[in-house]
């Protein structure tokens, strides 16, 4: 069963507040608003992130963003006032963990080992 792509989704308390925060994080407004309580961002090399308003589940999600230069992202996130102190590095990958305003966990991952998938 071939998989063409993937869509990550996270619940938020207020979709409009989440749109404001994620638009700053991604440097662009959502690519799609399929419903009033849903916003979606498409990534250049594939994949989507969907945020949807469901207050009772907000803050319980997590997803990973694959990046080519984690230090560049740390600098940009620091400028936005995001806590970038949760970093780690191994022989295969560097990671940074942050949280959105609702407490959803976001991992940034940079492959060091070229055999790792991007």
Segments (PLM) and residue ranges:
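N-terminal beta-strand motif that seeds the catalytic metal site of vicinal oxygen chelate
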Residues: 1-19, 61-63, 112-118
